Amino acid sequence: MKVKPSVKPICDKCKVIRRHGRVMVICENLRHKQRQG
């Protein structure tokens, strides 16, 4: 999980979602998991 000021999808399978007011990227490649904060 990377915590970044701005999250962007890295590959085609990355999905940008909102959980509890936080913007997150989930992907089947676990290296692409990101959270804004």
Curated annotation (Swiss-Prot):
Q: Please report the organism this UniProt entry assigns to the protein.
A: Beutenbergia cavernae (strain ATCC BAA-8 / DSM 12333 / CCUG 43141 / JCM 11478 / NBRC 16432 / NCIMB 13614 / HKI 0122)
Database matches in PROSITE patterns: RIBOSOMAL_L36
Q: Which PANTHER family match?
A: 50S RIBOSOMAL PROTEIN L36, CHLOROPLASTIC, LARGE RIBOSOMAL SUBUNIT PROTEIN BL36C
**Its family?**
Belongs to the bacterial ribosomal protein bL36 family.
Q: Which UniProt keywords apply?
A: Ribonucleoprotein, Ribosomal protein
One molecular function GO term is:
structural constituent of ribosome
UniProt GO BP: translation
UniProt key word Ribosomal protein: yes
Single GO cellular component annotation?
ribosome
Q: Which NCBIfam families match?
A: rpmJ_bact
What is the protein's name according to its record?
Large ribosomal subunit protein bL36
